[in-house]
Structures are given as structure tokens and as C-alpha cells.
Amino acid sequence: MEVNVKGNYVQVYVMLPLDAVSVNNRFEKGDELRAQLRKLVEAGVDGVMVDVWWGLVEGKGPKAYDWSAYKQLFELVQKAGLKLQAIMSFHQCGGNVGDAVNIPIPQWVRDVGTRDPDIFYTDGHGTRNIEYLTLGVDNQPLFHGRSAVQMYADYMTSFRENMKEFLDAGVIVDIEVGLGPAGEMRYPSYPQSHGWSFPGIGEFICYDKYLQADFKAAAAAVGHPEWEFPNDAGQYNDTPERTQFFRDNGTYLTEKGRFFLAWYSNNLIKHGDRILDEANKVFLGYKVQLAIKISGIHWWYKVPSHAAELTAGYYNLHDRDGYRTIARMLKRHRASINFTCAEMRDSEQSSQAMSAPEELVQQVLSAGWREGLNVACENALPRYDPTAYNTILRNARPHGINQSGPPEHKLFGFTYLRLSNQLVEGQNYVNFKTFVDRMHANLPRDPYVDPMAPLPRSGPEISIEMILQAAKPKLQPFPFQEHTDLPVGPTGGMGGQAEGPTCGMGGQVKGPTGGMGGQAEDPTSGMGGELPATM
């Protein structure tokens, strides 16, 4: 029976602390981390996830890479017998409420921004966001002769060359490619550092000169050179109904509105496609999986305009699937989706935010599965209680355990936010160990489960028109059981979720979505809907 049940095994990873490598690019916490990894091994965890910060490794100058601290960290992980998910973190960590560390993008890159501030994403007020370079400079050779995409490709190439021993040994199994703020493929539409607070709709962030020029050219090409960016979409903390653009039957449904939203979201998809193509060339032939992070923007999901998703770049409506288009692009690169909110229940949310994390998770996971992708998830808040774990288990195997083989749909893996002493002590540790057992279908840890094949070359380039065919018709998600059939103990209680957001795809505070590598969720997400004044 065990052979048949083995197909139900879902791998479990744990995000390492943000300061696993210090802000001065040193590995200084070896003894502490060694003890924590020992506890993870005892719990049966399959591996760990770590941010590999661009701002640390290439901080001293163009191509002046220093991988020494990360090599020491990776050696420790290897000796523990754990696998490793490495995040190419091209974004800033820090600068928001709850951030434990501050790691900006390289100073020499920011220096280019003092001469040309349009290298940064810019809102309609002219405020620059220095977390991540605008996709408008993807192909602009502004950085000592290199474009942004070339810098990212060179960084990944240097990583491959310096970490070859860990790639060859099968220690590194996942390369998660950062594509935006918090490492997520999105625009920085809801920055707390610029005054956004949950559940604001956010703003369109495309006012740098490079994206403005691109839009003007695109509008002229369809015979509307007079079209400009929306001027009725409100401000960061508006609700949809306070704006002409997002209200019911608003501007977003007009020809001009649809054109803008398509341009805005298509640019994001093309940005991901460009960088994943480079990542594929870099890691071609290695036994790794490429992955990207998609942000879990669950607030205003229940209103027709899906306003907060639209400002982030996800063109998702009741009759248009904004996530399957992304999945269609990823299919070309055989890349996986990493999504968040896996522990959240609608019943835990504020009614005023019109939030629906369960429906959102089901839509995104279904989109990935329909495109034949491996799909992974994270929790958004560091929760330790059976209620959260059981929600994750339900999402991991929507139809429950299949006694006769692999389920039709299941997560490829789950990454827990985040490693801390609080996780590996007392009842929290007991609950976590039980959770890992349940994710493994009560089977022993298997380091050889889901073996990686050599990464093949990306498929032929797909036109944006072909990608957009995935948007319609918008199909219903696959059915999900209400409860897991393999629960962790008694349910009830919130059991210790974090108050307020913490850090991004390994490091930024970004409110309500969780990060690929580890930020926490907005405090209203799973805390009964209270909106603290600090937000």
C-alpha cells in the first residue's frame, strides 16, 4: 500500500531567517542555524529556502561577486542532508514596518538612479520606488553598459559557476527567479513606505519615462495617440467604489480602459518571459526547477473590478483569467508557480475588504494545473495552529489522499514561513512535526521523492496573442474539499500568527500577501479583520 500512497507525498521546505547571511555579507550565525537545522531534520523537513541577495553578492561593484558567505551556508545545509531552494533576490529587503534587516539593491545601481531616477518604478505623484528596477529598463543598457536583464543573467551565471558543486550534488533543486518587489512578479502597487495601508486598492505604477514612452507608442499603433494613463483610478487607500475607474461598470470596462489594462499586464508577462528565458539558458541541463512567485492579492477579489489585482498587474476579472495567462507563459519555460495565502480562510477576513483568499488560491492553483505546471505554495502568516495547518493540507491535496496512486491534483511542494526558535520549541514544534508527517501522507521522509530531470531548453517563443488565449473562457476552479482528510489534531484558535507584516521574497514588508522567501501577511489576513492603526 505504501508504494501506491507515495504519490500523495508533498515536500515541505522552510524559509531561513532573513539574516542567515548578514547585511555585511558574512555567515555569522553558523552555530545557531546548525542547531535549528537539526530540529528541522528531526521534524522530517525536505529542505530549506534562502534569499540570495543581489545587494550583498554584487554590492561592491559591477561583476564584483562575493559568494563566500553563501558557500558556507550551503555547505551547512548540505551537511544537514537537506535540499535547497535558492531565490535570485533582485529586490530590496527592508524599509517597511517589521523588517528585521535592511538590504538595498547594489549601491552602484542606485547611483545610476541619482542621474536617471526613471530606472525605478514611479507612481502618478512622481514618487520613486527603489525596491526593484522598473521593467521599462529591462533592455536599456544604462548600468555600466549592461541592461537590467543582462545584469540578472550575469548574476545567475556567476551563481551557477560558483555553486556548481551544490548543483551537481543535487543539493540545489529550485531556482526561484525574482521578478519584482518582494521577489514577486508584480508592480509595486501597494507600498507601505509610500502611505498605502490595507485594504487600499493601490495605484498603477507605470509613470517612469520608459514605460510612458512604451505606452504612447502602443496607443499610437492602434490609432489612438491621444490616449493617456487613467486619471480616474484613485489613490493608494481608496476603495473601488470611490473611483470612476474601478466602480461597478467603471472605466475599466471601456475600450480605453481595456487597452490600458492589457498593456499594463502584458508588459509584466513579457518581463517574466524575458528573464525566465535567460534563467533557462543559465541552468540548462542542471537538475533544477525554475520557479516564480505570484502575489496573493486577496482583497477586493469579490468586487467585479478586482481592483487591487489590477493595479498589481494581474488582469483578472469574473470573465477573464489573469493567472492562467501567466501560467501559459511559464509553460514555455517548464517553470513552476509559487503562490501564497495557503493557510488563509475567508471566514478569518475583514468583510470590508471583500476578500476571498480561498477562492483566489483555488483559481491560481487550478490555472497552473490546467497548464500542466508544478504548483507550490507558502503560508502568508507564520501560524502554528492546527486550523492553519489543516487549511494548507486541504489545499495541498484538494481531493484528499488517493490510496491507489498520485492524486489528480496536488501541490508539488510547500514552503513554510519561517524558521525561528518559536517554530522549533514546545507545542508549536509538536504541531509542526505532525503537519510535516501529514504533508508526507504519514510516510517517512524520502530524499528521492520527485527526482529532478535535467532542465531542457525553453520552448519556442510564444506571441502575447497566443498567451492571451488562455484568459478566456474563464473556467471554474477544480473542486476542493472543505476539510482535509488527514488533519493535524483539533482545530480552532489562531495559535500565534504574527502581528503585522514582515519581510518579502525573503525580505520586504509588503502587507497582505506573503513573500517568496518570506514576508508575512497583512495583519487583517487571518486575524478576524481588525485593522491596526500601525497599518
UniProtKB/Swiss-Prot annotation:
Active site: 184 (proton donor), 378 (proton acceptor)
Catalytic reactions on record: Hydrolysis of (1->4)-alpha-D-glucosidic linkages in polysaccharides so as to remove successive maltose units from the non-reducing ends of the chains
GO biological process: polysaccharide catabolic process
Keyword Acetylation: yes
Tissue expression profile of the protein: Endosperm.
N-acetylvaline carried by residues: 3
Gene3D superfamilies, per the entry: Glycosidases
Role of this protein: Catalyzes the liberation of maltose from 1,4-alpha-D glucans.
Subunit comment: Monomer.
Protein name per its UniProtKB record: Beta-amylase
Species name: Hordeum vulgare subsp. spontaneum
